[in-house]
């Protein structure tokens, strides 16, 4: 029996030693800068109460489509638990299209909202699991939203546009998986909210990306 235990201990020890020697399984650096890029799916949660009120009686509602976008970030890890992150998120093409008839007159319309956000966030990693690093993120910054709308009836059309810039906030959670000690793939979910002139702009995001840690 003692010999069996010794044999299993030797085998397990050899496996652990082999895993530690694989470069791709080396633990990530505890501190230093990193740069990442990813693709984002954004699900709108716009506050369309005023627009819905204007559409009252038409049987229509302002139901904007979701969209896809791009996220670019640069950060610095102070230690294995805390990092600061600057990010640029570009989410074009939240669209609303409608085709109906009002009083027997055909009417069509479309509206598009494009969102760009620059944020500074605190990234907290409560568990040090070497390759797998779950985290919480909370931050704020500046959001810019541009809206274009067009309404058409036979023989006539009208268009309008608007641009607003104001503060915003985000909160979320995610996980980074270190493929090597330098390269990580990540998945993050977050909720965003604009404030003041952009209080109607709210949405959820899911971002998948890759980052290089120097």
Annotate each predicted stretch with a short phrase:
Residues 29-32, 36-45, 68, 72-153, ...:
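Gram-negative (and chloroplast) outer-membrane scaffold detector with strong preference
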Residues 133, 145-149, 179-186, 197:
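Substrate-binding/catalytic groove segments of enzymes
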Residues 31-33, 167-171, 181-185:
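A short pocket-lining beta-strand/turn micro-motif at the edge of beta-sheets
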Residues 71-77, 172-174, 184-186:
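Short, conserved structural micro-motifs that define repeat-unit consensus positions
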Residues 1-31:
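Cleavable N-terminal export/targeting peptides
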Residues 40-69:
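Long, hydrophobic/aromatic N-terminal blocks
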